[in-house]
Amino acid sequence: HPSWSLNQPAEILKLHGVDASEVFNSVSNVPWNGCRADSSVILDTVAALGMPLPMVASDDSHFYTGEECTNFIWLQADELNFDAIMDALKKGRFYASQGPKMAVEWDGSTMKVHCSPAKYVVFYTNMVYSAKRVAKGPGITQAEYQPGAQETFLRAEVIDEQGRKAWASPVILNL
């Protein structure tokens, strides 16, 4: 739980062999805890510094009073068995979600997102502003973004009408 644990980017950058990091943890949110459930800012900072980490979301259920079954990963496995699931995880064929579905295409110059009906599709990079970074709904099902030369990483986030999110893992840009 990077945000809940107050992990500093400098600490994370020293780690080796990290397969993924938790972008959202429901039990690290109110009413069970303080509002430190969302670690996307920390993970964006780490990606901007050259260490893009695949993003996962979890419930980390301790209480079972509403935090359970709210965060998970959607997985693109060829079959429903251990080997296929592990293969999909190792190859990065997954994304974190609270419900929204998404498919992300990256061709080296444009990121395209196809998603379940959403209020927003937001593209995040190391740059603080870009004119076409947010696609607005209601009910949008696709968006795309072409990063500029100064942008070093890129990821997408889908937000539905209920405020639930889906997070694509960041990619390093070599433009």
What is each stretch, according to the model?
Residues 6-175:
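Charged catalytic cores and adjacent phosphate/nucleic-acid-binding surfaces used
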Residues 2-3:
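Extracytoplasmic mature domains of secreted/periplasmic and thylakoid-lumen proteins
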